[in-house]
UniProtKB/Swiss-Prot annotation:
Cofactor: Mg(2+); Mn(2+)
Highest classification ranks of the organism: Eukaryota, Metazoa, Chordata, Craniata, Vertebrata
Residues making up the signal peptide according to the UniProt record: none
Pfam family, one: PI3_PI4_kinase
Name this polypeptide is given: Phosphatidylinositol 4-kinase beta
Length: 804
């Protein structure tokens, strides 16, 4: 922690053992000096701490003489009284006299009475210490980070059990951030920690099907480092089997199945109801030996047998991973792309279904994958691919009806509900726009929904009074809502901004067979959404959304997940400290020890793609995209570049991120840079070559975008780095504990060596003054700019992989 941080309650981790073992000293209420002429009331804990410090100093000075003196005093302890803190009073001086207080105690307090009093005092002191720790746990500043720290560091079962119960009081999203840490502690730490964590995990699994699957995937991934014989009988494996057995279903009443001829009651007239079809999409019958079987649509079966909740989603994810494995066997990228489109086209025959994209943050059902938009990403040995997924947002994933399949060749008859979310559509009207699946008993995939030849989609009536003139501008848009005073805008400013926007529209990339992802990633996200929606049979639904995801097979994403957690923690720290640094953490989903999913960064392409497509330097590309160096657009993009560059330089330094070639650094449409691919952090480096020895990557091209070494923006960059490092070290414990807990039982390359955590702590430079930190930042910036190893590694990547 930094010098300015003050803990609200000064309780150390070492106090826990004192609290729960009951070994605290007796309460010290009064200290008597001399013959009782003066007395001073002192806080008992302060006095005890002071006595302990004095005793330690005496032992350091006198060594063994103190120990011998203690033995002598201990032998005579029965002859005299004792102080309230348990230490014996001085007996006989050199002249043979005893103190007045000693004589009083000998006369008035027998030994047995003193023992009882001391026991009572120790009990009171123990209760006081317990209340101290309880006050810490119940104070408003006690957050999830502190709870995880106590759970990891405490050796007392009582504290661990209390923290396990305390987890129920925190928000779900706060605890979910530490889910990898909780599950790793459950797998690799002692039983007391596991017993404290398990009730919360089981409770959440009963509440959420998405949480259940994430736990199962993480438990499998973090158990993979164990020996195979140990892994079979580990707690993590047992809990994973419990989750996947679907025994943790919520204990609620089964859903009622509507009659076959009626739709859910949405207030429609009887004549309209007769056109609705009912659907039973809940029951899943699965035969693992013959892949997937079609959903049973018999209502009688559904009422008798509860569905397997997790099977459809698991099979959906398994299908996506299988595509990636098959693509990796093909030699050329063109063949991989053709195979990917064919595989996804077949996948669409199983959709819509009660499946979802785990990287999304809202409930939805997957209805379609536009297969022609999918692309294979750059990778030498593997075949990661990017897909776009059409979903329909719903209120509850498990209880909402799955929309019916609409054939691809069906022509939509209307576009009038393209922008319905803002037009006053009620929940009942939105629900009535869905039809349901007919009762077919065909044999097909477990997570698919039956195809329908003919479909009648009923659209809700529009409230025209709330949507009239939706594209017209109101005069109120340029006036304050409280005050109707007009805001005057100079005509010259309007003309200048319009001319800048027209003259410097973003460029497009040409199609490259060796890099098909460049064109797809360069297209603005808003245009892509509009284009795909227009060509989708589901695009007319008001709750239609477009998501994207990168599917990776053959890569261990556990290090990526760890780096993502550190980035989120640093982002939160800099926001709380009001340091204007910019980073873009992206979601990582670990499926197993060698597969997972990644949230793509939209509106961003790699610097390698920029240089290859434009054949320009980074500065000239900025000028081409944002206008001349005096325009508002360029200055904004330059500031964004500086703020993001400073942030990622600190991230790369603290985590020792390697493999920083231009294919792993993105540039978005607003000028930010985003680092991706954190496969080499902390103690690991590519092939252990040791090319990259600088603190971070800072090339001459980066400095040129900042305006040169003597520019104001370059000085601003160094100032941001200093402010960011000062803010980060104030909260060092929050960052370090995320990494330290994941080292337990891990065989990841980033944890090789015994000094990983110690070196991480040293990079926060807790012993330096701010002036010394400023000198350090200057040295790191200068060393990174002049680093010959950075140039060597870029050259190595160009020769071996063609990365510019």
């Amino acid at each position: 922690m930094g010098d300015t941080m003050v803990e609200p309650v000064p309780v150390k981790l070492s106090d826990q053992s004192l609290v729960l073992r009951g070994n605290g000293g007796s309460a010290l209420c009064v200290i008597t000096e001399g013959v009782g002429e003066a007395s001073l009331v002192i806080d008992p804990d302060v006095a005890q701490k002071a006595c302990q410090e004095v005793l330690e100093k005496v032992k350091m000075i006198h060594g063994s003489s103190v120990e011998s003196l203690d033995k002598v005093d201990g032998g005579d302890a029965g002859d005299g009284g004792s102080l309230a803190n348990g230490d014996t009073e001085p007996k006989l001086t050199n002249t043979g006299h005893t103190s007045t207080s000693s004589r009083i105690n000998e006369e008035e307090s027998p030994l047995d009475i003193n023992s009882v009093k001391n026991a009572r005092r120790r009990q009171k002191n123990n209760s006081a210490k317990q209340s101290w720790l309880l006050r810490l746990f119940e104070c408003k500043l006690f957050d999830v980070s502190m709870a995880i720290s106590y759970l990891y560091n405490s050796k007392e079962p009582g504290v661990q059990a209390y923290i396990g119960n305390r987890l129920f009081c925190f928000r779900y999203e706060d605890v979910d951030f530490y889910l990898p840490q909780l599950l790793n502690m459950y797998i690799h730490m002692d039983e007391d920690v596991g017993d404290a964590i398990k009730p919360y995990v089981v409770h959440r699994c009963r509440q959420s099907i998405n949480f259940s699957l994430q736990c199962a995937w993480l438990l499998g991934a973090y158990s993979s480092d164990m020996h195979i014989s140990t892994q079979r009988h580990s707690r993590g494996t047992k809990l994973r089997k419990l989750i996947l057995s679907d025994e943790l279903k919520p204990a609620h009443k089964k859903r009622e199945i509507p009659p076959l001829s009626l739709a859910p009651d949405t207030g429609l007239s009887p004549s309209k109801r007769t056109h609705q079809r009912s659907k039973s999409d809940a029951t899943v019958s699965i035969s693992l030996s013959s892949n997937l079987k079609r959903t049973s649509s018999n209502p009688k079966v559904e009422n008798d047998d509860e569905p397997v909740r997790l099977a459809p989603e698991r099979e959906f994810i398994k299908s996506l991973m299988g595509i990636g494995k098959r693509l990796a066997t093909l030699p050329t990228k063109e063949q991989k792309t053709q195979r990917l489109i064919s595989e996804l086209s077949l996948l669409n025959h199983k959709l819509p279904a009660r499946v979802w994209l785990p990287t999304a943050g809202f409930d939805h059902h997957v209805v379609r994958v536009p297969h022609t938009q999918a692309v294979v990403l750059n990778s030498k040995d593997k075949a990661p691919y990017l897909i776009y997924v059409e979903v329909l947002e719903c209120e509850n994933f498990e209880t909402s009806l799955v929309p019916v399949r609409i054939p691809e060749n069906r022509i939509r008859s209307t576009r009038s509900v393209e922008n319905l979310p803002e037009c006053g559509i009620t929940h009942e009207q939105r629900a009535s726009s869905f039809t349901t699946v007919p009762n077919y008993d065909n044999d097909d995939e477990a997570w698919s929904v039956d195809d329908i030849g003919e479909l009648q989609v009923e659209l809700p009536e529009l409230h025209t009074n709330s949507c009239d003139n939706i594209s017209q501008f109101s005069v109120d848009s340029i006036t304050s809502q409280e005050s109707k005073d007009p805001v005057f805008i100079a005509a010259g400013d309007i003309r200048r901004r319009l001319s800048e926007q027209l003259a410097h529209t973003p460029t497009t990339f040409r199609r490259d067979p060796e890099d098909p992802s460049a064109v797809a990633l360069k297209e603005p996200w808003e245009e892509k959404v509009r284009r795909i929606r227009e060509g989708s049979p589901y695009g007319h639904f008001p709750n239609w959304r477009l998501l994207s995801v990168i599917v990776k097979c053959g890569d261990d994403l556990r290090q990526e997940l760890l780096a993502s957690q550190v980035l989120k923690q640093l982002q939160s720290i800099w926001e709380s400290e009001r340091v204007p640094l910019w980073i873009r953490p992206y979601k990582i989903l670990v499926i197993s020890g060698d597969s997972g999913m990644i949230e793509p960064v939209v509106n961003a392409v790699s610097i390698h793609q920029v240089k290859k497509q434009s054949q320009l330097s980074l500065l000239h590309y900025f000028l081409q995209e944002h206008g001349s160096c005096t325009t508002e657009a360029f200055l904004t993009a330059q500031r964004n570049f500086v703020q993001s560059c400073a942030a990622y330089c600190l991230v790369c330094y603290l985590l020792q991120v390697k493999d920083r070639h231009n294919g792993n650094i993105l540039l978005d449409a607003e000028g930010h840079i985003i680092h991706i691919d954190f496969g080499f952090i902390l103690s690991s480096s590519p092939r252990n070559l040791g090319f990259e020895t600088s603190a971070f990557k800072l090339t001459a091209e980066f400095v040129d975008v900042m305006g040169g070494l003597n520019g104001d923006m370059f000085n601003y960059y160094k100032m941001l780095m200093l402010q960011g490092l000062i803010a980060a070290r104030k909260h060092m414990d929050k960052v370090v504990q995320v990494v330290e807990i994941m080292q337990q039982g891990s065989q990841l390359p980033c944890f090789h060596g015994s000094s990983t955590i110690r070196n991480l702590k040293e990079r926060f430079h807790m012993n330096m003054t701010e002036e010394q930190l400023q000198i350090l930042v200057e040295q790191m910036v200068d060393g990174s700019m002049r680093s010959i190893t950075t140039k060597l590694y870029d050259g190595f990547q160009y020769l071996t992989n063609g990365i510019m």
